[in-house]
Amino acid sequence: MAANIVPQKVEDVDTQALSPMMQQYLEIKRQHPNEILFYRVGDFYEMFFDDALTASRELELTLTGKACGLPDRAPMCGVPFHSYEIYAARLIAKGYKVAICEQMEDPALAKGLVKRDIIRVITPGTVIESSMLADDKNNYICSIYTRKVRSRWKTGICFADISTGEAYATELTAEKMGPAIITELCRYMPSEILINPALLDLKEVTNYVRQHTHALVELREDACYQQRVMEDAMTAQFGADWRNTCGFAQDGLVPYAFGALLGYLHETQKHGIDRIKSVQNYADAQYMRLSPVTRANLELTETMRGREKRGTLLWVLDKTETSMGKRQLRAWIEQPLVDSSVINQRLDAVEALYNANVTRADLKEALSHVYDIERLTTRILYGSATPKEVKALGDTCVYLPQVRQLARQCTTPLLQELSGAVDPLEDLLDLINRALVEDPPANLKDGGAIRAGFNAEVDELRDIMHGGKGFLSQLEAKLKEETGIPKLKIGFNKVFGYYIEVSRSYAASVPDTFIRKQTLTTGERYITPELKELENKILGANERLLVLEHQLFADLLEAISAQLLRIQRTAFAVAQLDVLASFAEAAVQNNYVKPTVDDSDVLSITEGRHPVIEQMLKGSLFVPNDTTLDETENRMLIITGPNMAGKSTYMRQNALIALMAQIGSFVPASSCHVGVVDAIFTRVGASDDLAAGQSTFMVEMTEVAEILQRATKSSLVILDEIGRGTSTFDGMSIARAVVEYICDNIGCKTLFATHYHELTSMDQDVDGIKNYNIAVKKRGEDITFLRRIVQGPADDSYGIEVAKLAGLPEAVIKRAHAVLRQLEATAPGANKAMQLDFETVEAYNNPAVPSEVVDKLNSLDIETLPPIEALNFLYELKQALK
């Protein structure tokens, strides 16, 4: 930084000493202290003082200085106005807000200081620019209003995507409000969250948002949630009958959340929030409950390691053709249904498209020409759409009748309903085709966007401009003849306009009517009254034409905006058709079958496959497996077997198949019957939560606790290696207690994988438990995982064999075999599959053990010994050793 550039905070600057422009800047900046101000100066957006310091650091821009009226220059940096979106996007991604301050008049016509004002504030949840948004993902802003009503938490929560006009809302009433709110946040994954002060008391929610999301949190004052403020905002947006229009309950809290959201949008967007025309109310019980842990473990939309799409369920099912369809597919995966009738409507539609190969192919071809009209309509409403984008809307309209007709060929109720919702928008197509040229410019100011014949004045001005060139040629020929100067020519530049240029050798032939304007080394430049008159006519026509084209294009945008609801309904229908066709295409390509979905308690899968792994292993054989779960004889499957054998894959595939069925997709199996599950819970894998100061075991127990508190009889629970994060006896005791609690108190369908082979005896004590294991083929000291699940407990843990496969040194493997043989010889009655901790191994190898203790150990039947008796026995041994 130069020595004469002194960083100053805006609040410390002496306003009176500043230049007029910097006074204007400071006045606007003080109204937006929490945003980085992009202040338009000519062809740049400039930033000053602390904003300049922040932006130069975050955007890696050169920091310079600007004379501002103070003894020292103000810190300054800037970005070109035509590429500001790139820089704004980077700031937004880092959690900043950006206020766009625009010149409100033409600087060339301004008298004195150019008028400037904020046209909008860009925040993470209010982005509409296509270059700043992911095509396949919605960008939601969330508003939460929560309070205690008679010692019980109640919450109104809503989500809106202003780039598409979608809005959703629900009322929450729960004893444990934290998990309920987190579940809703997981459904929509907002990039910005507005909260009222009372939410700060729900530490579970604030911790989740801080540690597991990238959302910007905006704390709104209680004044934003006052009844009068709420009613004014809702009335302004939806009319006096807003409560009926939106379907809000009389005593609900959603209106307060939505009113605060509208107030925030008015503050930041200034205009364009008319895009939100309606609100879709839903009940949290309308969708399958999926905790953040479950969503991550099942890798629905992003992988756990790389946070990538490849390797997820979304990646497998995405055969969509449109951006709208991609966003809808993601939403369906994030929100599986629990209403079997709605699920079956989707499945019937997918089946119809699955069976109609030609229709499906033609439909996908037509959809491939459909533009992202959801987001385009928002830019049209904001007035920021380009002529090329509006022409893309027209091009889309060409294919809408075909989309409608192809969907109508399938007679299922859902496809008939969606085909009827597709509006061909023929009037808009006609208007756009009449108004715009076939290949309009990307930028309106380049001119030439309006089609000939659309407006008489435009045609007249163009004739003048085009004819003007002919007039200039005629005038040049006339002057050459009159003056006898053969090399006389008429030219143009932006400084002098049109001029007559004559070389020095013909200076004596120049008539007195020529008025000298510029002297060159090679000659002189002149004007004449006739040339000046022609110049005014031509240049005036060009300026008037640009102004007129701008006005006509604005009128076109307004006319399209008036049809917003029609376009929005069509976009929603097209998106759903795209997803249904995608499901059908995935089913054909991947050999899926239509599942039977009903309200029974059955999960029966024949030859089920993991939808993702089988695609990742293309060219390799994926071994299918059967599953039978219900709420009576097969409530819980206890699965044993070595690591790497495929237990986790098997359990996850069952959860994914159930979820796929409940979003309306065909599934990877030869047959499948899914009784609707209201929630899927998973506890898979081990990981520390260092950010929260929690160990692996604490994380595991916290997740198990949530499952035991929230699972119902209709849930599907996946538990993998419960209790392995602590000592053997502690872990085994906890695992057994969890199994008993699920069977006795919840009764839900459960897959329980464990290394505690002692648990396999529980099938004798608890109804509904069945033992299964992953088949292994052993030859000498080598093993082969067959990946096939078979009934009965595992007969060995194969830990040493797995260690060998993992690449442990041969010396370690040999020593492990020797220790194992010694242990087996010392404890001949022990179960080979029993998992022993290191202390137990040392005890068996200790040659100083008294013979009385050895005798007691040899007489012990470990297989039938309950955990509590084992602890008492150990205590007696310890006393004997003293």
Where are these regions (language model features)?
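C-terminal tails and terminal domains of large nucleic-acid-associated
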Residues: P850-K882
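Charged, surface-exposed helical/loop "interaction arms" that form contiguous linear patches used
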Residues: Y382, T386, Y399, A452-G453, ...
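Active-site phosphate-binding and catalytic loops of NTP-dependent enzymes
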Residues: C101, P124-L133, G272, R408-L414, ...
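Long, charged, glycine-rich C-terminal linkers/tails
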Residues: Q103, I273-Y282, K478-G491, E585-E607, ...
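Amphipathic heptad-repeat alpha-helical coiled-coil/stalk segments that mediate oligomerization
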Residues: Y225-T235, M288-T294, M304, D395-Q474, ...
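ATPase nucleotide-binding head domains, primarily ABC-like/P-loop NTPase cores
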Residues: F49-A52, R152, D251, E321-T322, ...
